């Protein structure tokens, strides 16, 4: 029998440690990390670490052996090796003081491109769109970071430029569908080519960069994601018939900045097909023409000239002739079908008839992006402050003014004054919500996430039992009897009356049964015993049914496989936790309502 070698099959064959992979690829650990990020290869967790590590129990990182074999044929790997030799030659030249040689080496620095990796990882454009949300989150994060020793200003500026290009396309094509303002930032969701893309834009506050962040890893991800977003933006702009990259108006960028500084030009203009005159080179031989050839050429030219004149006369005659006009005499025009809109969502045309005047206290980048994405127009008060001839600007077409201050001294007629949350809630509900709930200085309704659990807690739905219970507690606590407390007492008495009515109905049914039994010749005591026995039988039946259901559940659990049983227990546990969370939120809502009622009473006093 052939003796089998140890550690050549199973986990020992399928996995390889990180140190072994670095030795196999002959690159540094930093280059190995960059290559794994570019190729999308990440560490794996074997079932048996001891067997995968060939008997050793030392903590280590494992990768699939096939993934490392796949990396060995990567063209970027060769560029990493070339860069390693380039760095050695450069340090040697600088050490010797050979400045000209070092300059020549720097000019011939080896560069690599990630185009082939992008095409490998994302074979179709839909695959790239599904993964573009991570790229957007990373780029918007770096666009908000200050320039430091680790992150240069060139990186932040290029990230900001790409983010503006993405926002300009989304606003031009009106792709925004949902928005949510949270503590971390503003979440947007857009529908791009049928794919839902969700990304986070942080607020423009001064950032304190923590010291424990590894910017080398983050910059590697940024390099890959910026290349991916370049591909995506080029495809989106060209499909929409726009020029990429879009031009930037320098004057507007200095004054206003943002989306209004970008000029989106159409790419549908027909290219002029002008024939360029051919230049004769010195090497071309010029043939001498004889007299006969010259005569025939002149005759041909004269004939062509006569034919052209005849054609022009015919064209003029055709233009002078008036064509017959055919008028439709039929009075019944029939059903006229409405043409389908260019935009498939009602959100795209939500603000198409409105002009918004944005106050200087409102963040313009958030509000302007949403207004333009919904077809509206925006005028910024902060922008008008920077203009010298702002008195010549006509603001009579303004329909809404967005204000985020409690009191307004002067108001303009024919304008609707709302707070910024009115825009967010209108977009999430795909309709214009009532503006009277969002007046300046008014307490706003709760701003809910559009991606919330529809089957869970609904904060908009009022729980009558909770309201009644909280009102009853307020009545007991409060000694003053004002109009509100009287209304609450009326509600409580109505609820008690309903319960008493139910009890009266049961008593009436019981008395009716007793009368029927007495009519059959059964005495009152015997009739009472019969009714009690019937009610006890009903209780026993209910109890028996409940036990049967429990036994049936237990039998189903027994018949399940181990995997199904674990999954069922997880589902049951998650549902119980969800119910607990819903109950906590209800209690919290009840407590908030109670404190609000107390504060309202104190204000009245």
Curated annotation (Swiss-Prot):
Compositionally biased intervals (Basic and acidic residues): 526-537
Chain intervals for the UniProt region annotation (Disordered): 449-553
NADP is among the record's keywords: no
Single Gene Ontology MF annotation: ribonucleoprotein complex binding
BRCT domain ranges (all copies): 346-440
Domain of life: Eukaryota
Subcellular localization(s) per the UniProt record: Nucleus, Nucleolus; Nucleus, Nucleoplasm
Gene3D superfamilies registered for this protein in UniProt: BRCT domain
Pfam families from the UniProt entry: BRCT_2 (PF16589), Pescadillo_N (PF06732)
Gene Ontology cellular component list: nucleoplasm; PeBoW complex; preribosome, large subunit precursor
Similarity annotation: Belongs to the pescadillo family.
Cited PANTHER family: PESCADILLO - RELATED, PESCADILLO HOMOLOG
Quaternary structure (record): Component of the NOP7 complex, composed of ERB1, NOP7 and YTM1. The complex is held together by ERB1, which interacts with NOP7 via its N-terminal domain and with YTM1 via a high-affinity interaction between the seven-bladed beta-propeller domains of the 2 proteins. The NOP7 complex associates with the 66S pre-ribosome.
Function as written in the Swiss-Prot or TrEMBL entry: Component of the NOP7 complex, which is required for maturation of the 25S and 5.8S ribosomal RNAs and formation of the 60S ribosome.
UniProt-recorded name of the protein: Pescadillo homolog
Gene from which the chain derives: NOP7
């Amino acid at each position: 029998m052939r003796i089998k070698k140890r550690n050549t099959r199973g986990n020992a064959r399928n996995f390889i440690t990180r140190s072994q992979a670095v030795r196999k690829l002959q690159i540094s650990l930093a280059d190995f990390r960059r290559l794994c990020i570019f190729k999308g290869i990440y560490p794996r967790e074997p079932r048996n670490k001891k067997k995968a590590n060939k008997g050793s129990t030392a903590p280590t990182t494992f990768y699939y052996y096939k993934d490392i074999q796949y990396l060995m044929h990567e063209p970027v790997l060769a560029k990493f090796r070339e860069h390693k030799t380039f760095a050695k030659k450069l340090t040697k030249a600088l050490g010797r003081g050979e400045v000209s040689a070092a300059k020549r080496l720097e000019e011939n620095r080896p560069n690599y491109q990630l185009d082939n990796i992008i095409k490998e990882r994302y074979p179709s454009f839909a695959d790239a769109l599904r993964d573009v949300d991570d790229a957007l989150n990373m780029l918007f994060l770096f666009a908000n970071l200050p320039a430091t020793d680790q992150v240069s200003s060139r990186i932040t500026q290029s990230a900001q430029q790409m983010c503006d290009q993405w926002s300009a396309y989304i606003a031009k094509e009106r792709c925004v569908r949902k928005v949510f303002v949270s503590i971390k930032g503003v979440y947007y969701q857009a529908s791009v080519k049928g794919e839902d893309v969700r990304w986070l834009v942080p607020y423009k506050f001064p950032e304190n960069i923590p010291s424990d962040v590894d910017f080398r890893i983050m910059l590697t991800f940024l390099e890959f994601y910026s290349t991916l977003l370049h591909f995506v933006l080029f495809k989106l702009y060209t499909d929409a018939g726009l020029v990429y990259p879009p031009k930037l108006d320098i004057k507007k960028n200095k004054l206003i900045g943002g989306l209004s500084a970008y000029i989106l030009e159409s790419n549908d203009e027909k290219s002029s097909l002008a024939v360029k005159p051919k230049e004769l080179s010195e090497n071309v031989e010029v043939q001498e023409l004889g007299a006969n050839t010259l005569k025939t050429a002149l005759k041909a030219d004269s004939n062509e000239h006569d034919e052209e004149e005849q054609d022009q006369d015919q064209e003029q005659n055709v233009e002078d002739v008036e064509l017959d006009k055919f008028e439709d005499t039929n009075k019944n025009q029939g059903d006229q079908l409405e043409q389908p809109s260019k935009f498939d969502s009602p959100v795209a045309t939500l603000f198409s008839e409105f002009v918004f005047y944005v106050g200087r206290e409102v963040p313009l980048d958030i509000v302007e992006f949403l207004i333009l994405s919904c077809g509206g127009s925006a005028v910024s008060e902060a922008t008008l402050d920077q203009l010298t001839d702002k008195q010549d600007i006509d603001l009579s077409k303004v329909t809404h003014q967005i204000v985020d201050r409690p009191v307004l001294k002067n108001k303009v007629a024919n304008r609707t004054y709302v707070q910024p949350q009115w825009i967010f809630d209108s977009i999430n509900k795909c309709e214009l919500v009532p503006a009277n709930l969002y007046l300046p200085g008014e307490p706003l309704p709760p701003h809910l996430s559009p991606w919330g659990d529809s089957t869970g807690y609904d904060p908009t739905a009022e729980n009558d039992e909770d309201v009644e219970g909280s009102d009853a507690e307020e009545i007991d606590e409060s000694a003053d009897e004002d109009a509100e407390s009287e209304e609450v007492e009326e509600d409580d008495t109505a609820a008690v009356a309903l319960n008493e009515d139910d009890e009266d109905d049961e008593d009436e049914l019981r008395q009716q049964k007793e009368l029927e039994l007495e009519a059959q010749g059964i005495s009152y005591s015997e009739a009472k015993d019969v009714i009690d026995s019937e009610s006890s039988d009903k209780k026993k039946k209910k109890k028996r049914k409940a036990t049967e259901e429990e036994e049936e559940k237990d039998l189903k659990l027994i018949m399940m496989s181990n995997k199904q049983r674990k999954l069922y227990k997880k589902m049951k546990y998650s549902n119980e936790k969800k119910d607990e969370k819903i109950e906590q939120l209800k209690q919290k809502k009840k407590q908030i309502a109670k404190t609000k009622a107390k504060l309202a009473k104190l204000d009245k006093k």
